[in-house]
Amino acid sequence: MMDTITNCTADVTIERENGGHAIGGLCGYAGTHSNPDICLETEGFSTKNYPSVIDNCNVTVNIKANGATHVGGLVGTGLYYYGEETVFKITNCSVKGSIDGAVTPGTVAGRAEGSTIESCTADVTIDENAGTEQVGTTTQMYESADQ
């Protein structure tokens, strides 16, 4: 079963003084693992609690996350578990605002490996201190030296 967030509006301010991971205007983690039973059997939690579909949401964000990785206007990242990234789908959403201090920021998602983002708009200012060579990366789990 896919959990869904639809037709929502949010005005979010998030402040993180030092470090962190998976920070998003709607949710830090999103997605469905191909085998959620692995998560239940091994660690006692299920990834079905994370939204798999985010549709028709409008979010204004002001995120200050000094040194944090995978910071996004809507979603921080998929849940990386047992060598596999969970996947999610974001459609018909808009995000505006600012992200300051993040090492690996993204206007919609901080990391979206294997996921789908369609028909979305973003007007998000990312400060000059971001690791701009990593903006939009899908190649590494943690890019910060602090992690």
Task: Please give the residue ranges for each predicted region.
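Surface-exposed loop/turn motifs in large extracellular/passenger domains
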Residues: 1-105, 109-147
